[in-house]
Each structure stands twice: as C-alpha cells, then as structure tokens.
Amino acid sequence: MQAVARKFDVAGRDERNRSLGKAGEERVLHHERAILASAGRQDLARKVRWVSQEDGDGAGYDISSFSPEGEERLIEVKTTNGWERTPFHISRNELAVADSNRDSWTLFRLWNFSREPRAFELRPPLNTH
C-alpha cells in the first residue's frame, strides 16, 4: 500500500464550519421568534437573543429564547450538512451548562442543512441519547 500526500486546508475547513454554524444559529433564531409570534407572544419574540453573536462564545448556548408560556429556553445549535447521525463537536462547557440547566437547556440539531434542512431537539442528560 502506498501513501498519498495531499494538502489539507485546515483554515478553510474551519471557516466553512463557522459559516455553517452561524447560518444554523440564524435559522433557529428566526424560528424561535416566529414560533413565539405565531403563539401571540410578540413580547417574548422581541426578547429572543443571539447570545453567541451578541456576547461571544462561552455561555454554553447560542440562543436565549422562551416557550410560549414564558419559560426560559437556552438553545445550543449544532448544524451539519450530513445526515442526522453525522458527528459534531460539543464542548465540556456546553455539557456542563446543559447539566446545570436541565430544565431550560436544549440542543437544537440541524442536519442536511445545505439541501433540505431537518431538525430535532435533545434535552439533558445528553449521555442518554
């Protein structure tokens, strides 16, 4: 067997992943606002925040939203172009925030994003999924 050398653009891959993640977060932000507005909760829709863009990474979630009943939702968005079981990275901080906010934290999983986006949500504890 012979090894084949090839160049791998790590910076390009990282930029594509960041762009994909940002697009997924933006889609979830609009989705959350639309759900609240359609439930007659424009007051809450106006309070939905894109935390990772406004405050930066490190909060352990990307979107701060609400249920139509007014309960807090802390949403971590994970987006891939592959199928629903495509691996994705979740940080120790995200896992810790999920564990300490089990009632409000949710992972919003977007997959097949560039073709026909699909989604599902996972709630803590994540090790059961």
How should each PLM-predicted stretch be described?
Residues 28, 32, 61-65, 73-81:
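Conserved catalytic cores of phosphodiester-cleaving nucleases, focusing on short active-site segments
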Residues 35-66:
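A short acidic/basic microdomain associated with nuclease active sites
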Residues 58-60, 70-72, 85, 102-105:
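Active-site lining segments that contact anionic ligands and/or coordinate catalytic metals
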Residues 39, 46-47, 69, 74, ...:
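Active/binding-pocket-proximal capping segment
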Residues 9, 56, 64, 124-129:
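Poly-acidic low-complexity segments
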Residues 1-41:
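A short mid-domain helix/strand-loop element embedded in enzyme catalytic domains
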Residues 77-128:
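Catalytic cores of nucleic-acid endonucleases
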